[in-house]
């Protein structure tokens, strides 16, 4: 119902000022709002954004401190950690600079591309960074994305997940981190533009361009396709940090082909790179290699910071099993402790587990599934037996014998008996 003064002059529905007392009176469905109330709302929203940013920037650790914390959770990848630490630190310092209003020099956003084999720690690095900075974080799988209007997930749904992670606090969400995995799977299907529409490859890259660069996106709070009549949330993506990751299988061949091309001739050694491993080859990565792989130049341009991760060797996998704060072996030991059971994994068994993961080419990601398979029967039994010791040996890992289960009670009584026998008469 429209509010009127003296049945003639319209008034603001919020502050009740008459039309002649304000500069503008904007009409909505059965309500009016004046320019002064709009300014007040804008100031409130800006203040909320400033407070949210201050909470983040006031607690930003230095790049060296970020690296030190990453070392507690992620094994190896020292160069990637250093690059990420500097990039993230500079990103949030840039936000502080922009918020201060001192814009004599424009600082552009620098999104990040992580390239490395499966299980090398790309996702874990992004997750750990978000924990360190205490900012909203969400992950998306690029393979599930399609262009708007096609069967699949819209890119705006990524922003919806970030909003949910921020508990629908728009100011906090606008300072969050989004990790998009498997970006190598949205590479253009061929190097030449196709006459048919590539809705899950180049089409997704095109759809991601705007939100990665910075735009005010309309985000459907209930998901876009099932509720077309809903009100949209406006989310500014200018200050959201995008980290993309992928294995980029085959890009090493592109790099090798490029680096060997200049040496082709009668005396050329075309197999010069055969002795190099993938990690060494990836260090020679150039932008043109990514273009040839299938990423469009505009998409690569939105990811100015590119870093490669090393393939994990046997020693690194053993370290991952035991050393980090949330090491997998520590987690399983704690799980068994909850059932009054001691878990013992011999060093030779750890080596055998690492060798299995290397053989499967799953990297660190495969370690948990190997351990889960080894310990399944033991976890099934100890919940009822209690007071047990479960020992995993190399033979257990190789499937030659079952996990060795002994009673802790009998072990303690045997020790006590031997101590009594050792006492001289």
Curated annotation (Swiss-Prot):
SUPFAM superfamilies: Glucocorticoid receptor-like (DNA-binding domain), P-loop containing nucleoside triphosphate hydrolases. Residues 1-53 form the ClpX-type ZB domain. Keywords: ATP-binding, Chaperone, Metal-binding, Nucleotide-binding, Zinc. ATP binds at residues 117-124. InterPro entries: AAA+_ATPase (IPR003593), ATP-dep_Clp_protease_ClpX (IPR050052), ATPase_AAA_core (IPR003959), Clp_ATPase_C (IPR019489), Clp_protease_ATP-bd_su_ClpX (IPR004487), ClpX_bact (IPR046425), P-loop_NTPase (IPR027417), Znf_CppX_C4 (IPR010603). GO terms for cellular component: HslUV protease complex. Zn(2+) binds at residues 12, 15, 34, 37. It holds the Pfam family zf-C4_ClpX. One of its GO terms (molecular function) is unfolded protein binding. ATP-dependent specificity component of the Clp protease. It directs the protease to specific substrates. Can perform chaperone functions in the absence of ClpP. NCBIfam families: clpX, PRK05342.1. This is ATP-dependent Clp protease ATP-binding subunit ClpX. It comes from Rickettsia akari (strain Hartford).
């Amino acid at each position: 119902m429209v509010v009127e003064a003296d049945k003639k002059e319209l008034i603001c529905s919020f502050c009740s000022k008459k039309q002649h007392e304000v500069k503008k009176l904007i009409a909505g469905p059965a309500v009016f709002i004046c320019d002064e109330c709009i300014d007040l709302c804008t100031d409130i929203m800006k203040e909320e954004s400033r407070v949210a940013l201050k909470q983040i920037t006031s607690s930003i650790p230095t790049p060296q401190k970020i690296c030190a914390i990453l070392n507690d959770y992620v094994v190896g990848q020292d160069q990637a950690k250093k690059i990420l630490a500097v990039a993230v630190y500079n990103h949030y310092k840039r936000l502080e600079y922009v918020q201060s209003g001192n814009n004599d020099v424009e600082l552009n956003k620098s999104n990040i591309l992580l390239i490395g084999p499966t299980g090398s720690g790309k996702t874990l690095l992004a997750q750990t960074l978000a924990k360190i900075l205490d900012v909203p974080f969400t992950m998306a799988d690029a393979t599930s994305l399609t262009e708007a209007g096609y069967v699949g997930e819209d890119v705006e749904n990524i922003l919806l997940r970030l909003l949910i992670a921020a508990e629908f606090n728009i100011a906090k969400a606008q300072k969050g981190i989004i990790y998009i995995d498997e970006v190598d799977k949205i590479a253009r299907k061929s190097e030449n533009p196709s006459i048919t529409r590539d809705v899950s490859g180049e089409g997704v890259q095109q759809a991601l361009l705007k939100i990665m660069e910075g735009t005010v996106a309309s985000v459907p709070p209930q998901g876009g396709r099932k509720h077309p009549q809903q009100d949209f949330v406006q989310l500014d993506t200018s200050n959201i940090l995008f980290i993309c990751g992928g294995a980029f299988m085959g890009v090493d061949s592109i790099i090798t082909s490029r680096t060997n091309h200049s040496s082709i001739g009668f005396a050329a050694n075309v197999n010069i790179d055969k002795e190099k491993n993938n990690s060494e080859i990836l260090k020679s990565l150039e932008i043109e290699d990514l273009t040839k792989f299938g990423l469009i130049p505009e998409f690569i341009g939105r990811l100015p910071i590119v870093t490669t991760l090393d393939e994990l060797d046997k020693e690194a996998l053993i370290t991952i099993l035991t050393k980090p704060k949330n090491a997998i072996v520590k987690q399983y030991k704690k799980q068994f402790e909850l059932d009054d059971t001691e878990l013992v994994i011999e060093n030779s068994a750890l080596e055998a587990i690492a060798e299995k993961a290397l053989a499967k080419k799953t990297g660190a990601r495969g370690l948990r599934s190997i351990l889960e398979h080894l310990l399944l029967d033991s976890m099934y039994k100890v919940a009822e037996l209690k007071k047990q010791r479960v020992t995993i040996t190399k033979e257990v890992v190789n499937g030659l014998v079952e996990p060795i289960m002994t009673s802790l009670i009998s072990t303690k009584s045997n020790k006590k008996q031997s101590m009594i026998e050792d006492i001289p008469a």
